């Protein structure tokens, strides 16, 4: 119903809310008794039957049913529909007794609602009725008469679903046998209801005119009338004859009413259609009644014969036929010649007005029922009738529809045959039919290309066959004579029109081919039985006639049977005979016609070279290939013997005119033909070959023609015709298999391949020659080659040679060469080969194809389109190979040789990424095809054959560069004590992939493809392949600064899904892990790292790992493999297992000799294991670690020379280096985990710190050896130890100090820390001076991270006491002392260094210096006095010079990006370093700015304004800051009131932490923006106000959303927590309202000011409001408020600083200093100076800056007050 106040869909009325009303009525039984009155007036008793009283109703009907029945009386469609559906459900669900209670009220409801306007309601009503019937069954009987009339109407509903539902309900109520009885039982009531609807009802009586629109009333009335007419027809069909008699009076009464007959002229087509259907039924079932009303029936039906409505037409014509049959004197009541026939002829002339398919099948029965009296003169009548039919065929509507055209043609021939049958002896009629109708009709169809010829030819052939059959079967000589005369006349006239068509010089091809088609159909007529059945099925007046009226049926159709029966009887024997047999009556005239047409055609060909006549001749000969016809085609001159030919051919030509014609005429035509569509000439050739007596003769002729006479194009067409027709193939099979054709094709292949390789341009007909080869190689039927097998092999060999030579040609040459044609030929050969065995040359060809597909374009020089062709050709060949029944790996040459070639490619050849990708793709395609092989072992054997042996794998692994070790060594995951590699990987940086990578990826690709077949490989081949791929992937992953082609290699594997996750599903993890453990225990190194990666990626627990090594003792004595295995397992072992491993090592630390200390099974190896366990914090026994420290200390005493203190490392052995590295690692880990709370003795601290400093000195003294990996590792570990010591002492707390030795802290600060940084700072400068362009990931710069991290702990004093060489720039303007300027000039350039650790270390060191620098400018501040017009002072020159260089770099990186579009900078890229350095430089400048005094800040800000550096920064920041600067982990926490953002959290500039690198630049950009807004608010405000609108909005929106609240809170907090005291002024702050209140008091004067921060602070203006004002004049008050507002808006500082400036200004005012009369302020708002420049005339003083502005803006040099010249 919709909402109570919603817009209604119709009527715009509010809903009736019928559901609620019905419920109320159901409840209030006392108020409304029963059903009386609801929905009607009190005079209408509603639904109450007369037999019951109102007081009994409530007890009989269920309350739910009452509510539903009330709903059904409502007008709303939706209410009724839902109520009816609910009623149906209740009928199904409720018990029978409850449903039976509804029956007394159902008839009236049903009768009303079954006529409802809405079709959905009507459908639902019938569906609900069916459910009611199924429930109550026979109890419906008492109420049947009340509903049957409407029920019958419902079955004729114009809405098919409603009608179907009513029929379903009727069938549910009565079985088919009982339905007539049920109808008969209610016939009187039905007739009464239907007659009332037809005669009494009007639109206004059926519907309420006041509530129902006129259109709806009319529609309902028309539907009711239609249903009533159809229901009457249904009643007539249902009732048996004996029941119909009792209704005759009823029908007479109906037919006597003029209103009934008016329905025949009704404006609604459905009503007329139903009317005519009822008339047909009345004629059929009550013919006597209709005869009595003949005067009304005949005009009503016959005068409507031109009704062209498609709805009415079928019913009308059925009524016409029934009227003619039932009412014999119907023509007495109409004027046929003036009224009926003119309308009929008009319809026919117009082609049935689009209804020919419906109307024309009735024409034959119609004319068969016409009495002779009304057709006189019959010659004119039938002539007019047939002429009208032919005219109708020419209408555009008929020609555009094949069904319409076919119907007209069919009707024409049916009527023609009938008229001929009825008037066979009448010469004049016969001549009219043949000469004036049939022949002109044929001529019309032949002339008009828009008509469909097929139906006409079929009907003509069928007509001739029927006449011939009748002539053969007829016993009356007169009848036979008449029929023969008809046929003779027909053939004579047909010959004339056909010859006339052919004789036209400009006859078009369609016209002449139409003639040949007609002759062909007459030669081989199609089955006429099908047409006959089709015709009889369309005579509808004989259908569905009950048994009682068989006599009527016979009388109605007897004439039709007589007219057509003889046809059918004569045709049946013809239809059973072969279609190729022609009647003798037809054979002679047809042959004469063919010969005559051939003669005419050949004359046109000879004289005018007419191509259309040649095509006609071809089609003619195809149907009539006889010697007589060929004899006609030869002129007298051409009947002599063929000369210059072999004797056999000459003899054959003498005997056979067809062969003679072939040589004299056809060969010349074939060779002269320039058109591609010359196939009709080849058809003539086949027609001539059919005339040869044997296959030998045909072979001789074709062999002779092949040698010299036939062109390649003609030869191609001959073979194509043979392949397209089995009959033609049978004619030429001996020739196709013969040697003449085979040798010629082999020679053709030689010619084509050699010619195209030598000269890339091909002749115009070469594509035809290639097509000929392709056709010859393709197989035909029964797996047999089209030509001889030996010739196929020879051609394949030649094609193979051609493909092999492609590598020697350029890409351009290959594009135009024969390779493309070869691919087409070979592809066709493979595709058509079926299941036949491949010959050896084919397998060699397959191998070459595979090699071309598996190599990159750089090697093959083939364009892309050729590669695609080659691939398709290869796959078709391999597909053929694997489906051979007897194909195995050993038998296949291709499979064996392809394996060898693949192994050679990946193990011996130099492959780059592109080559490998192509190879993998080709191998995958090949394996994908092999998967489909029926031989299950083939795939496994193939992969096993490609698999290298163990020794080959080992050789490839050893060939891999070992630079991968660098990262595991630095990270402490592996330990080595021998020299492993010498140089950076860059020296070996080529594009060639190592063979191991190629081999492992190839085999991985193979097993991925093979998984479709669930392959089981023997001897752990699958696990070995996966292990080798993991080895390759781990090698790539461990490489630092790997060449770009290796990342490309990994990308290729990802793209091809060659990943461990995809391969792991193919093998059990346990077997793979066991294999890896075995290899790790044996070899260590990369295999150990693979185990760690596998355990991590597969989330394998320590309990699952344990079975693989069983006993821990098995790892000892230590080898390199067992050491590396334990180191890799440590992160995944349980704490207890690590303790057990540690326990195995403890005894080994005691009693070592000097040599044993450095060996793997000595101190070095065991200490390495201990370090690995300690690194995972699994050893918490502090005493144990303290004991090991003491042992190491004892080594220092016993074997001092193994400690590399202050020595030359070039003399140290790798074993000693390795031991020192492990000792340093232990000391670092000891400091991190155990130094506190474990108290150490002074000697132990001395040992640690002195050793650290000595190792650092060694590192510093051996810079030349940093390229040696172990030396570099030694340096890194020594820096780590120094860094850990610095971190330890930096984070020390008072609690820890109490447990440390007394002088330890002072010793650290005074000696050790100073010693560390005095060594590292020069070392850093020297290291980066030699390698300016190396990134932090390179080998040489690996030590930068620990070195730089250590330098971040350097103190300011240590920096200032540096010993760096002087570095000064002559042009630099500076107030700094030389040693400080040197430090700046040395450290500042490091902000642009390529390595991030250096940039961050330089920032940290410079950041400690920045607060010291402004003081040096402060001391020289007087030199920047008031004399300058706009004084400006540069921040440190070194920083500004660097900033200038950085701005140029940033312009290149970000300049082209619009402001507001976020740029993502790739971590550690070159651009990353540029942006990082730029942002760090600005952080330093802002730190410097914040440390300066107010006066200095004014000078610095003026400098920044002049250089516009700040503007550039702000533009760049809005390209770098993220749209949502929220931390990732807090972005999800929506409930958090204050989520963490990049503005609330300080950026951590960590050197070692790399996990946050993607957020490094965005966070840093936000930090710089925050500092800029905080420290330079006035300058940012100025930039914002001057920016364009788009940028203005972006900045305002972003700042208001993310920054303003943070800054406002910080500003208010700084006021609240400020310790600054003002004499005479108090300051308070309110955080909630963002207000600051300042109260200034001096003597009796009180001034209170309220400062309000804007929502977009600091971009918006700060408002100053007045509070208390005591003792101050209004004007002065306003001036002071304006001054404060100006200070807060234009000064770059905090609110407290602005208030301090304002207070000083007021104080000076009270001290007697006058305001400057230009700015009306005592203290200048920008440079904080007092008014000093006095006018000599008026003695007023002004600020120097204000005067300068006055002079420049006014262009005068006068005093602003007295206007006298200012001196």
UniProtKB/Swiss-Prot annotation:
Residue ranges covered by zinc fingers (RING-type): 1716-1763
Expression sites by tissue: Widely expressed, including in the brain and spinal cord.
Cellular location(s): Cytoplasm, Cytosol
UniProt region (Disordered), positions on chain: 550-583
PTM per Swiss-Prot/TrEMBL: Autoubiquitinated.
InterPro entries linked: ARM-like, ARM-type_fold, LTN1/Rkr1, LTN1_E3_ligase_6th, LTN1_HEAT_5th, Ltn1_N, LTN1_UBC, RING-CH-C4HC3_LTN1
Chief localization: cytoplasm
Keyword Metal-binding attributed: yes
Matches recorded under PROSITE patterns: ZF_RING_2
Record-level Gene Ontology MF annotations: ubiquitin protein ligase activity; ubiquitin-protein transferase activity; zinc ion binding
Signal peptide: none
Role: E3 ubiquitin-protein ligase. component of the ribosome quality control complex (RQC), a ribosome-associated complex that mediates ubiquitination and extraction of incompletely synthesized nascent chains for proteasomal degradation. Within the RQC complex, LTN1 is recruited to stalled 60S ribosomal subunits by NEMF and mediates ubiquitination of stalled nascent chains. Ubiquitination leads to VCP/p97 recruitment for extraction and degradation of the incomplete translation product.
Subunit structure: Component of the ribosome quality control complex (RQC), composed of at least the E3 ubiquitin ligase LTN1 and NEMF associated with the 60S ribosomal subunit. The complex probably also contains TCF25 as well as VCP/p97 and its ubiquitin-binding cofactors.
Similarity field: Belongs to the LTN1 family.
Protein name as catalogued: E3 ubiquitin-protein ligase listerin
Native organism: Mus musculus
Record gene name: Ltn1
């Amino acid at each position: 119903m919709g909402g109570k106040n919603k817009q209604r869909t119709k009527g715009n009325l509010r809903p009736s809310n019928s559901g609620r009303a019905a419920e109320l009525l159901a409840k209030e039984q006392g108020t409304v008794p029963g059903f009386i009155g609801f929905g009607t007036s009190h005079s209408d008793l509603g639904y109450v039957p007369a037999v019951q009283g109102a007081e009994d109703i409530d007890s009989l009907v269920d309350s739910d049913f009452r509510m539903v029945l009330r709903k059904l009386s409502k007008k709303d469609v939706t209410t009724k529909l839902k109520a009816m559906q609910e009623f149906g459900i209740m009928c199904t669900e409720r018990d029978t007794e409850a449903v039976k209670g509804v029956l007394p009220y159902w008839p009236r409801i049903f009768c009303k609602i079954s006529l409802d306007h809405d079709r959905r309601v009507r459908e639902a009503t019938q569906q609900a009725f069916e459910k009611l019937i199924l429930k109550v069954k026979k109890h419906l009987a008492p109420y049947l008469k009340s509903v049957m009339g409407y029920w019958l109407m419902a079955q004729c509903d114009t809405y098919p679903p409603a009608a179907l539902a009513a029929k379903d309900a009727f069938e549910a109520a009565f079985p088919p046998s009982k339905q007539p009885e049920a109808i008969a039982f209610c016939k009187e009531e039905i007739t009464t209801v239907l007659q009332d609807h037809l005669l009494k009802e009007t639109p206004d009586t059926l519907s309420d005119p006041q509530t129902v629109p006129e259109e709806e009333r009319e529609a309902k009335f028309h539907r009711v009338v239609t249903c009533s007419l159809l229901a009457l027809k249904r009643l007539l069909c249902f009732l048996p004859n004996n029941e119909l008699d009792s209704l005759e009076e009823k029908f007479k009464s109906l037919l006597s009413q003029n209103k009934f007959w008016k329905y025949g002229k009704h404006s609604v087509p459905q009503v007329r259609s139903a009317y005519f259907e009822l008339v047909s039924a009345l004629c059929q079932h009550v013919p006597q009644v209709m005869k009595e009303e003949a005067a009304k029936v005949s005009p009503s039906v016959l005068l409507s014969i031109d009704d062209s409505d498609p709805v009415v037409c079928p019913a009308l014509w059925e009524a016409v036929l029934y009227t003619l049959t039932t009412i014999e004197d119907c023509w007495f009541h109409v004027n046929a010649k003036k009224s009926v026939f003119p309308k009929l002829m008009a319809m026919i002339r117009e082609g049935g007005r689009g209804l020919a398919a419906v109307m024309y099948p009735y024409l034959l029965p119609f004319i068969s029922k016409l009495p002779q009296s009304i057709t006189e003169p019959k010659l004119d009548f039938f002539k007019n009738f047939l002429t009208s039919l032919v005219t109708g065929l020419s209408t555009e509507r008929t020609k555009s529809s094949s069904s319409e055209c076919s119907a007209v043609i069919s009707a024409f021939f049916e009527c023609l045959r009938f008229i001929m049958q009825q008037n066979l002896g009448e010469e004049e009629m016969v001549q009219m039919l043949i000469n004036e109708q049939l022949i002109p009709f044929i001529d019309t169809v032949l002339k008009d290309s828009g008509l469909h010829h097929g139906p006409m030819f079929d009907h003509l052939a069928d007509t001739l066959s029927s006449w011939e059959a009748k002539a053969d079967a007829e016993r009356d000589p007169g009848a036979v004579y008449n029929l023969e005369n008809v046929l003779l006349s027909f053939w004579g006239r047909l010959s004339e029109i056909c010859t006339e068509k052919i004789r036209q010089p400009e006859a078009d091809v369609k016209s002449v081919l139409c003639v040949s088609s007609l002759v062909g159909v007459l030669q081989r007529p199609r089955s006429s039985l099908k047409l006959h059945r089709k015709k009889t099925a369309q005579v509808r007046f004989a259908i569905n006639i009950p048994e009682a009226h068989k006599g009527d049926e016979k009388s109605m159709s007897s004439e039709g049977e007589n007219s057509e029966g003889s046809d059918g009887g004569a045709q049946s024997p013809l239809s059973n005979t072969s279609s190729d047999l022609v009647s003798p009556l037809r054979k002679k005239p047809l042959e004469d016609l063919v010969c005559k047409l051939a003669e005419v055609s050949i004359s046109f060909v000879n004289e005018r070279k007419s191509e259309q006549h040649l095509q006609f001749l071809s089609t003619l000969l195809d149907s009539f290939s006889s010697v007589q016809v060929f004899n006609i085609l030869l002129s007298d001159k051409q009947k002599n013997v063929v000369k210059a030919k072999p004797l056999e051919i000459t003899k054959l030509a003498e005997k056979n005119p067809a062969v003679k014609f072939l040589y004299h005429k056809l060969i010349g035509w074939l060779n002269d033909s320039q058109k591609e569509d010359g196939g009709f000439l080849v058809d003539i050739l086949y027609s001539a070959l059919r005339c040869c007596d044997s296959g030998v003769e045909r072979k001789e002729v074709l062999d002779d023609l092949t040698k010299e006479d036939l062109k390649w194009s003609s030869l191609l067409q001959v073979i194509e015709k043979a392949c397209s027709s089995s009959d033609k193939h049978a004619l030429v099979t001996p020739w196709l298999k013969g040697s003449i054709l085979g040798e010629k094709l082999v020679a053709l292949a030689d010619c084509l391949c050699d010619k195209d390789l030598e000269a890339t341009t091909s002749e115009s007909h070469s594509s035809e020659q290639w097509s000929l080869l392709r056709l010859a190689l393709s197989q035909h039927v029964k797996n047999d080659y089209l030509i001889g097998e030996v010739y196929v092999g020879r051609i394949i060999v030649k094609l193979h040679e051609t493909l092999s030579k492609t590598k020697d040609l350029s890409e351009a040459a290959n594009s135009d060469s024969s390779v493309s044609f070869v691919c087409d030929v070979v592809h066709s050969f493979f595709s058509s080969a079926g299941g036949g065995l491949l010959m050896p040359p084919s397998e060699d060809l397959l191998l070459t194809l595979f090699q071309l597909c598996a190599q990159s374009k750089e090697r093959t020089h083939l364009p892309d389109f050729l590669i695609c062709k080659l691939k398709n050709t290869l796959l078709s060949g391999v597909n053929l190979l694997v489906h051979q029944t007897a194909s195995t790996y050993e038998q296949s040459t291709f499979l064996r040789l392809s394996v060898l070639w693949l192994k050679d490619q990946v193990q011996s050849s130099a492959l780059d990424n592109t080559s490998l990708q192509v190879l993998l793709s080709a191998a995958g395609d090949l394996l994908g095809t092999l998967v489909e092989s029926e031989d299950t072992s083939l795939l496994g054997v193939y992969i096993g054959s490609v698999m290298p042996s163990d020794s080959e794998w080992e050789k490839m692994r050893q060939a891999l560069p070992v630079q991968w070790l660098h990262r595991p060594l630095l990270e402490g995951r592996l330990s080595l004590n021998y020299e492993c590699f010498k140089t950076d990987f860059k020296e070996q940086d080529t594009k060639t992939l190592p063979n191991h990578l190629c081999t492992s990826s190839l085999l991985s690709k193979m097993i991925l493809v093979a998984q479709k077949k669930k392959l089981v490989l023997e001897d752990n081949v699958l696990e070995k392949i996966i292990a080798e791929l993991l080895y390759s992937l781990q090698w790539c992953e461990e490489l630092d600064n790997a060449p770009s082609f290796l990342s490309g290699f990994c990308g290729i594997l990802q793209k091809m899904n060659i990943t461990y996750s995809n391969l792991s599903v193919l093998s059990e993890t346990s077997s793979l892990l066991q294999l890896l453990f075995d290899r790790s225990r044996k070899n260590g190194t990369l295999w150990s790292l693979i185990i760690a990666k596998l355990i991590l990626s597969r989330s394998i627990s320590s309990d699952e790992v344990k079975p693989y090594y069983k006993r821990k003792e098995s790892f000892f004595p230590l080898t390199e493999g067992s050491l590396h295995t334990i180191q890799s397992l440590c992160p995944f072992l349980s704490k207890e297992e690590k303790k057990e491993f540690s326990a195995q090592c403890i005894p080994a630390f005691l009693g070592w000799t000097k040599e044993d200390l450095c060996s793997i099974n000595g101190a070095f190896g065991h200490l390495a294991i201990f370090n690995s366990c300690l690194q995972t914090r699994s050893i918490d026994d502090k005493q144990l670690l303290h004991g090991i420290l003491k042992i190491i200390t004892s080594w220092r005493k016993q074997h001092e020379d193994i400690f590399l203190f202050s020595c030359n490392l070039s003399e140290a052995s790798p074993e000693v280096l390795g031991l020192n590295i492990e000792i340093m690692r232990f000391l670092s880990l000891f400091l991190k985990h155990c130094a506190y709370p474990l108290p150490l003795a002074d000697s132990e601290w001395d040992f640690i710190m002195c050793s650290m400093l000595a190792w650092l000195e060694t590192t510093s003294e051996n810079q030349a050896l940093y390229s040696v990996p172990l030396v570099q590792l030694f340096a890194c570990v020594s820096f780590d130890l120094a860094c850990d010591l610095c971190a330890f002492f930096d984070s020390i707390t008072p609690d820890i100090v109490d447990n440390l030795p007394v002088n330890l802290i002072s010793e650290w600060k005074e000696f050790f820390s100073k010693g560390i940084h005095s060594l590292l700072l020069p070392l850093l400068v020297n290291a980066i001076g030699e390698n300016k362009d190396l990134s932090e990931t390179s080998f040489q710069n690996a030590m930068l991270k620990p070195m730089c991290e250590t330098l971040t702990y350097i103190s300011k004093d240590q920096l200032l006491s540096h010993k760096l060489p002087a570095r000064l720039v002559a042009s630099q303007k500076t107030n700094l002392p030389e040693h400080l300027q040197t430090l700046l000039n040395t450290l500042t350039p490091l902000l642009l260094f390529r390595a991030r650790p250096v940039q961050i270390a330089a920032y940290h060191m410079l950041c400690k210096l920045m607060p010291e620098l402004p003081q040096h400018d402060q001391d020289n501040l007087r030199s920047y006095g008031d004399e300058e017009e706009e004084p400006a002072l540069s921040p440190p020159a070194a920083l500004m010079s660097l900033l200038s260089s950085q701005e140029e770099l940033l312009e290149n990186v970000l300049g082209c990006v619009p402001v507001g579009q976020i740029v993502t900078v790739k971590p550690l890229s070159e651009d990353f370093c540029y942006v990082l350095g730029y942002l760090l430089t600005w952080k330093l400048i802002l730190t410097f700015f914040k440390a300066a005094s107010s006066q200095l800040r004014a000078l610095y800000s003026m400098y920044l304004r002049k250089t516009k550096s700040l503007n550039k920064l702000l533009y760049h920041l809005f390209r770098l800051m993220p749209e949502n600067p929220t931390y990732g982990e807090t972005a999800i926490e929506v409930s958090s009131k204050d989520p963490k953002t990049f503005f609330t959290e300080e950026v951590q500039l960590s050197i070692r932490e790399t996990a946050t690198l993607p957020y490094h630049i965005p966070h840093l950009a936000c930090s710089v923006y925050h500092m800029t807004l905080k420290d330079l608010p006035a300058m940012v405000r100025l930039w914002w106000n001057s920016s364009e609108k788009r940028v203005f909005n972006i900045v305002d929106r972003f700042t208001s959303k993310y920054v303003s609240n943070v800054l406002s809170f910080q500003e208010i907090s700084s006021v609240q927590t400020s310790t600054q005291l003002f004499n005479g002024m108090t300051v308070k702050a309110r955080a909630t309202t963002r207000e600051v209140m300042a109260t200034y008091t001096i003597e009796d004067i009180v001034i209170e000011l309220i400062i309000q921060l804007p929502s977009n602070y600091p971009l918006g203006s700060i408002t100053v409001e007045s509070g208390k004002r005591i003792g101050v004049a209004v004007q002065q008050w306003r001036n002071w408020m304006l001054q404060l507002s100006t200070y807060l808006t234009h000064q770059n500082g905090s609110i407290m600083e602005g208030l301090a400036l304002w207070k000083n200004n007021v104080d000076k005012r009270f001290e007697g200093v006058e305001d400057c009369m230009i700015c009306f302020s005592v203290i200048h708002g920008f440079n904080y100076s007092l008014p000093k420049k006095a006018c000599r005339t008026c003695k007023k003083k002004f600020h120097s800056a204000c005067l300068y502005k006055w002079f420049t803006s006014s262009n005068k040099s006068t005093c602003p007050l007295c206007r006298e010249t200012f001196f």
